[in-house]
Amino acid sequence: MSDIDQLNSSLLAEIAATNDEPALEAVRVAALGKKGSISELLKTLGAMTPEERQTRGAAINALKNAVTDAIAERKSVLKMAAVNARLKAETVDVSLPVRSSPAERGRIHPISQIVDEITAIFADMGFSIAEGPDIETDYYNFTALNFPEGHPAREMHDTFFFNPDENGERKVLRTHTSPVQVRTMEAQKPPIRIIIPGKTYRQDSDATHSPMFHQVEGLVIDKKANVANIRWVLEEFCKTFFEVDSVTMRFRPSFFPFTEPSFEVDIQCDRSGPIVKFGEGTDWMEILGCGMVHPNVLRYGGLDPDEYQGFAWGMGLDRIAMLKYGMPDLRDFFNADVRWMTHYGFRPLDMPTLFGGLSA
């Protein structure tokens, strides 16, 4: 056996005998380091004749490659063994009770939960979320939504007005999220499918009204939108939101400045118990308003009403939260009572999804 064969056998045996990566590294340095045994052999190539390089030189290179491959393979084996040993030492007793984390002790406010639920429903229908400022101009809050001069909503007793600016213009705390509809029409070409959740403000306060409350509106603009589309969208929403197999709805003629025709929508329910049950019973409850977007509103949004049409709807988030989860007093939403939040709040990690259950 030649000296190269002997060195090959010796090094491969040393590599196979290593039990950890430091020992393997020591073998590598002894063989392939600057003063390693294989490196010393490589230094002799310059003094060889051409014939010797073809035989002995090739054998030395083959030795180097064999040792390099063996080291790489052994390193992979040792790494896997180290991982397995660590995993074995880190075994967890899954029968132990889970300690409550700070995130688990906290609660999501019902309004935030309702917004997430509604977003999940309409996102599945292809809607996106639009937002706008809480402080609005008279133009976007009233004029662009077809409110005539002298309309009661423009009066001080119903709307929060700011003091006039240097130009005499008074801004308002928006009384609805509808201004975002006009802003979206100005900024985005049809087709448009949006929902608009947000805070709104009116001078009203009792068990079912608050000076600051939450609304969500929806808007669809295209060339073929019609009342049948409104009915389908709202029926599908109500079935999914109230988590029932079917709902019976009725549309009553109404009036809103920004829609024509306009409807109030009632849903059939059972109000005999402390919690309203939807999808059953013989009672009726109004839940939202809707209608076809008024041609004047389309014009204010920069759209031609002879080419485009649309429908819109709006509802109070606080009210439908009270209906769905049996909350008796709207004012409790804003009292920051930890006991109330513990009872009515939702766990932070239980995000509502259509496949997992909205209120699971």
UniProtKB/Swiss-Prot annotation:
GO terms for cellular component: cytoplasm. It catalyses: tRNA(Phe) + L-phenylalanine + ATP = L-phenylalanyl-tRNA(Phe) + AMP + diphosphate + H(+). The gene is pheS. This is Phenylalanine--tRNA ligase alpha subunit. The keyword Cell cycle does not apply. Its EC number is 6.1.1.20. GO terms for molecular function: ATP binding; magnesium ion binding; phenylalanine-tRNA ligase activity; tRNA binding. Its cofactor is Mg(2+). The keyword Nucleus does not apply. InterPro entries: aa-tRNA-synth_II, aa-tRNA-synth_II/BPL/LPL, Phe-tRNA-synth_IIc_asu, Phe-tRNA_ligase_II_N, Phe_tRNA_ligase_alpha1_bac, Phenylalanyl-tRNA_Synthase, tRNA-bd_arm. Mg(2+) binds at E260. Disulfide bonds: none annotated. It comes from Rhizobium etli (strain CIAT 652). Tetramer of two alpha and two beta subunits. Its main location: cytoplasm. It is an enzyme of class 6 (ligase).
